[in-house]
């Protein structure tokens, strides 16, 4: 391969690309690599599910776990969407304090909750708590909200959004509930189930973004990065 005096490739094909397409491909690849060097993603979460979701879309990132005091945010008197956005914001802000000198840092923080009849269902305290939650969800529709914030450290520019997904549970017998609790999966999950694991067998259908239920609406996140920060994942 060579470039002529005008910077154009010679007329030949390589891996099925005509020369004009090859030039465009090379330039776009160079731009993408250069653009990637302009920022560094930091995920302010230790959630293995969020890490996996980001990896699945090809995003390169490192994890710096937030030490924010989530009890400082009360869900009383505000909508679930606002509540998760505020939780994500304090996580992002707490993590930003750790990397203030890193002007390439772009922080991604998120929080997910389950609501039923306007009541927030957090992580179960024990097996009995998980049993109560799963019994209340049986045969009914509930909502999963994930709030996320993207914060650019160099100037503090921050965008926070939330996404809602409706989840419909099957009718669950006590035997099924007990069997699911025995797997240990509900213990660290909001609403006492994980849709990406065995808990997916409890779900009849969903209306909305599946990844949002897992813990991070990556499609909406990618749109925010592109429209608000001029960062393209794809």
Q: For the regions a protein language model found, what residue spans apply to each?
A:
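Extreme N-terminal basic, low-complexity initiation segments
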Residues: 1-12
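Compositionally biased, intrinsically disordered low-complexity segments enriched in Pro/Arg/Gln/His
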Residues: 26-28
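N-terminal polybasic phosphate/anion-binding patch
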Residues: 32-106, 119-120, 172, 182, ...
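GST superfamily/GST-like fold recognition
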Residues: 38-59, 140, 155-157, 164-234
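Residue-level signal for inorganic ion chemistry
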Residues: 54, 88, 111, 130, ...
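Active-site-adjacent loop/tail segments of enzyme domains
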Residues: 83, 112-142, 171
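Short beta-strand and adjoining strand-loop segment in the mid-core
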Residues: 119-122, 149, 162-170
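Anionic-ligand binding region
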Residues: 133-134, 147-152, 156-159, 164
